[in-house]
């Protein structure tokens, strides 16, 4: 019986990306931060819920800050230095996520609000009575 040659474990080479894009999706319940390259391929991501916050603590600015720091540190392995930020949604973690990415050491070149605005599409949820 022929012996199958064993594959030696090879170290995977990470591609080096100088410029990236940070997509921040800030909803009322959670904040999702994805860092991609210029083509939109995801390099790293983090969420408030995945960072250890559950329930109503997910929707705090501090949870968004922690998630942005985790995504930012993970993307530094790819050599990302400059970020273009796209913010979507009305959530409380919008500004704190941008500040956290800045504090990690990224040079933020542009901030764009890409929140979808309906041209009178679906009926919005009813107003809360607290």
From Swiss-Prot:
PROSITE patterns: RIBOSOMAL_S11
GO cellular component: ribonucleoprotein complex; ribosome
Complex and partners: Part of the 30S ribosomal subunit. Interacts with proteins S7 and S18. Binds to IF-3.
TM ranges: none
PANTHER family documented for this protein: 40S RIBOSOMAL PROTEIN S14/30S RIBOSOMAL PROTEIN S11
Pfam hit, one: Ribosomal_S11
UniProt-listed InterPro entries: Ribosomal_uS11, Ribosomal_uS11_bac-type, Ribosomal_uS11_CS, Ribosomal_uS11_sf
Family named by the database record: Belongs to the universal ribosomal protein uS11 family.
Protein name: Small ribosomal subunit protein uS11
Keyword field: Ribonucleoprotein, Ribosomal protein, RNA-binding, rRNA-binding
Superkingdom: Bacteria
Gene Ontology molecular function, alphabetical: rRNA binding; structural constituent of ribosome
Protein function: Located on the platform of the 30S subunit, it bridges several disparate RNA helices of the 16S rRNA. Forms part of the Shine-Dalgarno cleft in the 70S ribosome.
NCBIfam families: PRK05309.1, uS11_bact
